[in-house]
Each structure stands twice: as C-alpha cells, then as structure tokens.
Amino acid sequence: MSLPSTRVEHAGVGTIGAGELVTAPEAERTALIGGGRIGILGGTFDPPHIGHLWLATLAADALGLSRVLLMPAARPPHKGAQPVSNAADRVMMTRLAIAADPLFDLSLIEMEREGPSYTVDSLVELRASLDDSETLVLIMAADSLAEIGSWREPDRLLELAEWAVGPRPGWPLPDRGALHERYGEAAARIHLLEGPSLDLSSSEIRRRVAAGRSIRYLVPRAVEELIVDRGLYHQP
C-alpha cells in the first residue's frame, strides 16, 4: 500500500524560495513503497549531513529495507528554546541531500502537523496507512537510544516499529542483556548495527560555516551549495 500522497514525496528537486515551504507535484508526492520493511529516520536536519545518510544506508543494508523515509521535524521537542533554522530551508536541504539516491524519500508529515513533532504521533500516522505485511523500522544512533526514555511513549514506539540502532562515537552499542532487562521480549525488535561510526554533527557543521571553514564532503555538494547561496549559519 502507498503512503498518503499528501505526506510523502519522492526526492526530486523543485524550485523553492527562501522561507517558502511547498509540496511536490502529485506524481512526486506519491511514494510507491510496495511492502517490505520501511526505514524511518527523523531529525531536525539543520543541516542534513553524510552521517545521517550513512546511518540510514547502514540500516538499509543490514535489514534489507525497501525504502528509507527522512522525516524533518517541524518543532523538535528536545530542542527547547534552542533556535532552529526555518522549515523551508531544512526541507529543501533534506530534499537535496537525498535526491540522487532512489533508496530515500522525504516525509513531510511532521511539517504538516500542528504542535510538537513527537515521533510516536508520526509512527501512528504512518502505521495506519500501511498493510499488516509492512514493517516500520525506526532508525537512530546509540546516543538517541540512551535518551529514548525521555521521548514520548517510548514503549509505544517499540510496539509501532522495530528499532535499528547504529554506532556513534562515544556511545557504545548496548548489550543484549541490558536491552532484555529493560524491554523484555520486545527487545528482539531492536537491531544493533555494526559498522563504522562518523564523528559528525549538525552543530559542528553550523560552527564551521560560522567560522568560515570548509564543510566539503561533510554534507552532500548540493546541500553545501544551498548553504552558501542562502547564507545559512553565517554569523550576522
């Protein structure tokens, strides 16, 4: 079954002005998922970088995902009062980051929903649009797993989706015993991904841009060009 056409678009790039949030044409918005396991990678994506793409690719390769949806958060609840770039720029950067890879699609469901962007609400919405034979896999790094107790309804998250947890420098993957102690039999739905970890963060990229330093090869080239063209992250 296809995901709702108003909420998921293929990663083709259209024209978008600064501060303008638009949806793609109908043909681009319809993602023909077609069964199997569907990865979900949420984030602020301010900006998206190769660490995000590598984590998604690591999960897809290990678990045989048919598609990975990148889901920018409109109002990330964990950011608090921390400033976040406008939604239009973050959506466009994410679209550009994934445009060249057919594995990826862009989900705008959190951009279209009012209120804080809680992952559990997004999974409920996505789950309702899928067949029973289709499985959602929530992709995260080990630091997110360590903090997931502070997320809204973490146990419900594990009911709605399997978890794929990748490595992050300074955050070792948990052992199976600890996961079973916390989640019981549901721990079998948590997949630990072995592979290289990249010591990279969006905040570090923003700092480098503000300092006038290169971000070449830390973000996709099209994302770098958009950051330069729009003067994003430069100190006033």
What are these regions (language model features)?
Residues 2-236:
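Nucleotidyltransferase catalytic core that binds NTPs
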